[in-house]
A protein has these predicted regions:
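Conserved short histidine dyad/triad with adjacent acidic residue
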Residues: 36-55, 89-92
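Short acidic-glycine-tyrosine-enriched beta hairpin
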Residues: 74-91
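Short, conserved beta-strand element in jelly-roll/cupin
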Residues: 45, 54-70
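Short histidine-centered beta-strand/loop micro-motifs
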Residues: 50-55, 71-72, 97-98
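A short, N-terminal "cap"/entry segment at the start of jelly-roll beta-barrel domains
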Residues: 1-42
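Ligand-binding loop in jelly-roll beta-barrel domains
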Residues: 90-111
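Conserved hydrophobic/aromatic beta-strand scaffold that supports enzyme active sites
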Residues: 32, 40-44, 60, 77, ...
Length: 111
């Protein structure tokens, strides 16, 4: 966040509208806060969610509720459950998300 100045603020997620994103199977619901150089999202993947694309973007991801499988293009997989996080840089480890039971994530990345 070098050079980005963000004054103290709170986020009341109940006041942030949700957008719906259809994927290969299931739906992703996003609540997004966009700041200069920073995107903060509360993301809910429905039961049976399978991302329709491989993502090359870097993120900080924290699992608030549920379980998600993060599949990397090299075939490896990492499972996040409530209270776990992962971090990844842009263009370093192409990945996608899959969940059978549904999950709620807090995702922070660049714009």
């Amino acid at each position: 966040m070098t050079g980005t100045k963000i004054p103290f603020q709170t986020i009341d997620w109940s006041n942030i509208s949700r957008t719906e994103h259809q994927d290969q199977t299931g739906v992703a619901y996003w609540q997004t806060i966009q700041l200069e150089g920073l995107r903060i999202r509360m993301v809910e993947y429905s039961k049976g969610y399978f991302a329709d694309h491989w993502c090359e973007k870097g993120h900080i991801v924290h699992c608030l509720q549920g379980k998600v499988v993060n599949e990397l293009k090299d075939g490896s997989k990492a499972i996040l459950t409530s209270g776990m996080s992962y971090v990844i840089s842009d263009d370093l480890s192409t990945h996608r998300s899959i969940t059978d039971e549904g999950v709620i994530l807090l995702i922070i990345d660049g714009d």
